[in-house]
């Protein structure tokens, strides 16, 4: 009989608080979230995947039919539902930080900003341009720069800023685990 691995020592210190991964599109939130959740014995949720499942259509189609405002409303509803649960790593959509009311839910957990930097993000986005509704313009790079400038001060509100390069998602997850204790109160000392 296979025994499940012992939970990570941080799990108890986290006290069930959700970890919310934020960052620009293509910053690696989903790919990093899965191994991070596995390492911590947490569940994993991708808000974009939940929205697609509930709407029964892909995000680009939601944007074309409902507009960005309609999508952001759905995103906030999904975030509110997720916020009722605990012990989750949550990969959020890149613009989730743009609605002030979302921060009430985000701040109930720990907010982690994944920042690969502009050049790496543009490289990743060029490889995946068809699935990014906000970049379907004459000048996608200018649209990206505008979005990034608008969101940067909001991403800076995160509890933990993680600079990422070309590391594998497992390595980024380990980096997050390495930095998390700095955000948590020290474990209680046993007198004896």
From Swiss-Prot:
It is an enzyme of class 2 (transferase). This is Shikimate kinase. The keyword Cell cycle does not apply. Pfam families: SKI (PF01202). Its main location: cytoplasm. Gene3D superfamilies: P-loop containing nucleotide triphosphate hydrolases. Its cofactor is Mg(2+). SUPFAM superfamilies: P-loop containing nucleoside triphosphate hydrolases. Pathway: Metabolic intermediate biosynthesis; chorismate biosynthesis; chorismate from D-erythrose 4-phosphate and phosphoenolpyruvate: step 5/7. Catalyzes the specific phosphorylation of the 3-hydroxyl group of shikimic acid using ATP as a cosubstrate. The lineage of its organism: Bacteria, Bacillati, Cyanobacteriota, Cyanophyceae, Synechococcales. Binds 1 Mg(2+) ion per subunit. GO terms for molecular function: ATP binding; magnesium ion binding; shikimate kinase activity. One of its GO terms (cellular component) is cytosol. ATP binds at residues 26-31, 132. Belongs to the shikimate kinase family.
């Amino acid at each position: 009989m296979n025994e499940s691995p012992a939970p990570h020592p941080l799990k108890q210190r986290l006290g069930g608080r959700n970890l919310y991964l934020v960052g620009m599109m293509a910053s690696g939130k989903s790919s990093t979230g899965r191994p991070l959740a596995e390492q911590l014995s947490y569940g994993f949720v991708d808000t974009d995947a939940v929205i697609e499942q509930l709407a029964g259509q892909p995000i680009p189609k939601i944007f074309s039919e409902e507009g960005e405002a309609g999508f952001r409303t759905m995103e906030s509803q999904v975030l509110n539902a997720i916020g009722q649960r605990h012990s989750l790593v949550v990969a959020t959509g890149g613009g989730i930080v743009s609605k002030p009311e979302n921060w009430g839910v985000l701040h109930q957990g720990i907010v982690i900003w994944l920042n690969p930097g502009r050049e790496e993000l543009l490289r990743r986005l060029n490889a995946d341009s068809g699935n990014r509704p906000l970049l379907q313009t004459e000048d996608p790079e200018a649209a990206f720069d505008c979005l990034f400038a608008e969101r940067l001060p909001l991403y800076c509100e995160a509890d933990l800023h993680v600079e990422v390069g070309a590391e594998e998602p497992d390595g980024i997850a380990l980096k997050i685990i390495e930095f998390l204790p700095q955000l948590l109160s020290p474990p209680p000392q046993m007198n004896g």
